[in-house]
A protein has these predicted regions:
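Short glycine/proline- and aromatic-enriched beta-strand/turn motifs that initiate or cap beta-hairpins
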Residues: 1-67, 210
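Transmembrane beta-strands of outer-membrane beta-barrel proteins
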Residues: 3, 27-31, 75-81, 99-101, ...
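Predominantly the C-terminal beta-signal and adjacent terminal strand-loop region
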Residues: 1-4, 8-17, 154-215
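Short loop/turn motifs that connect adjacent beta-strands in outer-membrane beta-barrel proteins
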Residues: 12-27, 68-77, 109-120, 164-178, ...
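Extracellular loop and loop/strand-boundary signature of outer-membrane beta-barrel proteins
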Residues: 46-52, 86-93, 141-146, 192-196
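Gram-negative (and chloroplast) outer-membrane scaffold detector with strong preference
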Residues: 59-131
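Residues that define the transmembrane beta-barrel architecture of outer-membrane proteins
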Residues: 1, 25, 55-61, 93-101, ...
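Transmembrane beta-strands of outer-membrane beta-barrel pores
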Residues: 7-9, 33-39, 67, 81-89, ...
Length: 215
C-alpha cells in the first residue's frame, strides 16, 4: 500500500490563475470512428504505418467530452472522458463498450505570415476499462501465452485542422476541427501489477470531428 501527496507553491492571497478568464468555461466534444490498426502507436503508426490489422478486422466508434484545465501560450491541458463502442461481432467477440479517463496536452501550429492557427496536435495519457477484452488483445496475448486485462493504460495521439479556414466564420463549424485520432490500449510492457502484467495491447486509427463550446 502506498500513499502520497502534492503541494503547489503559490500565494494564498493571490491564487495562481491556470485559465484565462475568457476561456474559463471552455469545453469540447468529439466524435470519431475508425478501424483496427496493425502497428503500434509508437514507432509504427506515428511513422506513417496505417495498415489495417492482420489479426482482426474490427472497427471502433466513440464520443468524448473535455474540460479545459489549463491554458498557455504553447500548450493547453484538458481533462477528457471518452466512451467507445467496439464492433467485433463479425470476429465472434460481440459488440461492447470501453471507457477512458485521461489528460491531454495540446499544442498549436501557426502560419508564419498571418499568425493564424493552422493545425493542432495533442498527446493523451490515462486509463481504459473495457466491458470485454478486445479480440486483437486476446489473440496477441494468447499467441505469446500472456495475460489479458479489461483495465489497461490508455494513450491517444491527435492531429487536426480548424474548419474555419475552409468554411465562413459565421458557419456552425467555425469552432470545430477535423482530423485523425489514434487510440491505444496497453499494459506498459508488462511492468504493472495493477494492469495484470499485460505486455502489448491494441490500436485503432480513427477520423474525428471535435467542436469547442463555451469559449
Amino acid at each position: 500500500f502506498f500513499a502520497g501527496g502534492t503541494y503547489t507553491f503559490g500565494n494564498v492571497r493571490e491564487p495562481t490563475a491556470y485559465i484565462t478568464p475568457e476561456r474559463a468555461s471552455e469545453r469540447s466534444w468529439r466524435v470519431n470512428y475508425g478501424y483496427q490498426a496493425d502497428g503500434n502507436i509508437v514507432s509504427e503508426i506515428d511513422q506513417g504505418d496505417f495498415r489495417r490489422s492482420s489479426v482482426a478486422d474490427t472497427n471502433i466508434g466513440g464520443v468524448s467530452f473535455a474540460k479545459l484545465l489549463s491554458d498557455g501560450e504553447r500548450v493547453d491541458f484538458n481533462g477528457k472522458l471518452a466512451i467507445f463502442r467496439h464492433f467485433e461481432e463479425d470476429e465472434g467477440n460481440g459488440n461492447f463498450f470501453s471507457y477512458a479517463a485521461y489528460i491531454t496536452a495540446t499544442g498549436r501550429g501557426f502560419s508564419p505570415w498571418t499568425d493564424q492557427e493552422v493545425f493542432r496536435y495533442s498527446f493523451g495519457f490515462g486509463m481504459s476499462y473495457a466491458d470485454k477484452v478486445p479480440i486483437t488483445e486476446q489473440r496477441k496475448q494468447a499467441a505469446k501465452g500472456n495475460n489479458t486485462s479489461r483495465f489497461l493504460n490508455y494513450l491517444e495521439l491527435q492531429l487536426d485542422f480548424p474548419l474555419r479556414r475552409v468554411f465562413r466564420k459565421t458557419s456552425v463549424l467555425k469552432n470545430c476541427y477535423a482530423g485523425v485520432t489514434v487510440v491505444h490500449r496497453s499494459g506498459i510492457f508488462g511492468t504493472s501489477d495493477i494492469l495484470g502484467d499485460v505486455a502489448g495491447g491494441s490500436d485503432w486509427i480513427t477520423a474525428h470531428l471535435e467542436c469547442k463550446a463555451g469559449s
